[in-house]
Regions:
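TPR/Sel1-like alpha-solenoid repeat signature
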Residues: 36-39, 43, 55, 62, ...
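TPR/TPR-like alpha-solenoid helical repeat scaffolds
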Residues: 107-123
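Long, contiguous interaction/recruitment modules in multidomain scaffold/adaptor proteins
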Residues: 1-31
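Flexible helix-coil transition and linker loops at the boundaries of alpha-helical arrays
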Residues: 25, 63-69, 104-106
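Residue signature of alpha-solenoid helical repeat architecture, marking inter-repeat boundaries
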Residues: 27-31, 70, 110
């Protein structure tokens, strides 16, 4: 009976450690994602569009890993705006349409409105 109790305690401890590990890992990824988005916005405002694209692209990759749809839509939207500023309208529309799709899935009306305004200014 003591062995069964010991094995049960070990399993519970192991399960607790796994939960703790994944929570810490998720928190780290969220912090990294926030930092990437912030750096992208800073560079976009400073006019460093190519550098901003790199940050937003990395942020987009993180959103796929973490299934963070809200940040995914924002990263796509920002990449669309950058391509618009660079005069690459086809790429801009592609990213903005992708962002629109995610905003629609999330039923984010504010996000949808800003994408609509951006796409109308391209047409």
């Amino acid at each position: 009976m003591d062995i069964i109790t010991l094995l049960g305690a070990i399993c519970l401890a192991y399960g607790g450690m796994l939960i703790l590990y994944y929570r810490l890992r998720t928190t780290e990824k969220r912090k990294e994602l926030s930092q990437l988005m912030l750096n992208g916005i800073k560079n976009m405002r400073r006019g460093n569009l190519d550098k901003a694209l790199i940050y937003f692209d990395k942020a987009y990759e993180y959103t796929i890993e973490t299934n963070n749809r809200e940040e995914m839509a924002d990263a796509l939207y920002n990449m669309g705006i950058i391509y618009k500023e660079k005069g690459e309208m086809n790429s801009a529309m592609e990213y903005l349409n992708s962002a629109q799709g995610v905003y629609d899935e999330l039923q984010d009306k504010d996000g949808s409105k800003k994408v609509t305004a951006a796409t109308q200014s391209i047409r």
